[in-house]
Amino acid sequence: MTASIDLSSYRDQHFKGSRSEQERSLRDSTTLYVGNLSFYTTEEQIHELFSRCGDVRIIVMGLDKYKKTPCGFCFVEYYTRAEAEAAMRFVNGTRLDDRLIRVDWDAGFVEGRQYGRGKTGGQVRDEYRTDYDAGRGGYGKLLSQKIAPNTDNR
């Protein structure tokens, strides 16, 4: 394998199975995790970019588990490993919607994984962010809740 398609150190902590089963699934997978997306990036934009590397089988948009709105990630599944490897080589680190996107191997989409795992429904990484990021909903959600004006005082 070349460096651009090697497995990263990230592992899904909710994977159902042993570490060796997860490693095997990642090495055989045709599914990619795509992160650092703008909340406004559409499935059509993702399809247009990733279809340059092969036939996309399915795209599953990551959603806020409470609002059911996009929350900055998705899964892209190809028909073959070679197509997924091409996306790892050529799409990882490219710009989409003015953001550098991150592409990583995924062991395969399982229903329920399309929802953010953070306390407020989105991604954990967006809950504690202290910088303002217009493409990802402004300030971090937990910080926004702390500084939101109290409108109940009359």
Swiss-Prot record:
Gene Ontology biological process terms, A to Z: mRNA cis splicing, via spliceosome; regulatory ncRNA-mediated gene silencing
GO cellular component: a single term: nuclear cap binding complex
UniProt KW Nucleus keyword: yes
Iron in keyword set: no
Signal peptide: none
Domain RRM per the UniProt entry, residue ranges: 30-108
Compartments in which it is found: Nucleus
Binding site for mRNA: 10, 33, 102-106, 113-117, 123-124
Pfam families linked to this entry: RRM_1
Molecular function GO terms recorded: RNA cap binding
Annotated keywords: mRNA processing, mRNA splicing, Nucleus, RNA-binding, RNA-mediated gene silencing
Domain of life: Eukaryota
InterPro entries per UniProt: NCBP2, NCBP2_RRM, Nucleotide-bd_a/b_plait_sf, RBD_domain_sf, RRM_dom
Family assignment from sequence similarity: Belongs to the RRM NCBP2 family.
Subunit structure: Component of the nuclear cap-binding complex (CBC), a heterodimer composed of Cbp80 and Cbp20 that interacts with m7GpppG-capped RNA. Interacts with Ars2.
Function, as annotated: Component of the cap-binding complex (CBC), which binds co-transcriptionally to the 5' cap of pre-mRNAs and is involved in various processes such as pre-mRNA splicing and RNA-mediated gene silencing (RNAi). The CBC complex is involved in miRNA-mediated RNA interference via its interaction with Ars2 and is required for primary microRNAs (miRNAs) processing. Also involved in innate immunity via the short interfering RNAs (siRNAs) processing machinery by restricting the viral RNA production.
Protein name (Swiss-Prot/TrEMBL): Nuclear cap-binding protein subunit 2B
